[in-house]
Amino acid sequence: MRGPLRILAAAAALASAAAWAQSPSASGRDIFLRADKGNCIACHQVPEGAGPAVRANMGPRLDAARLKGWDRARLRALLDDPMRANPDTVMPPYGRHRLLDAGEIERVIDYLHALP
């Protein structure tokens, strides 16, 4: 009985991974993780399974509970120029300095909204 259950569990995990890779937020995850793009993971932690297990702590941990109430417009404004909300932040102005284009910012927002 254990054999079929293990096979079923493995199939479910693979299906979940395949669905994640095809989701709109997968591109945002790539930007979030890439050092030559957003590199958000250098400062922020994400829930287990949503990115690498790192212990970055310069920025806040990002998860569904922390991001509750952050709609697309608020996240877009923050990613464009976080210094407008907090002049003392060390977070780079991704939009204002053209580190990310508008489409890339939208995909990062898709990823953030998909976090558990």
Labelled PLM ranges:
Residues 8-17:
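Bacterial N-terminal signal peptides
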Residues 28, 37-47, 108, 112:
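The canonical Cys-X-X-Cys-His
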Residues 16-35, 51:
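Electrostatic cytochrome c docking/interface patches
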Residues 37, 83-84:
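Generic structural signal for secondary-structure transition and capping sites
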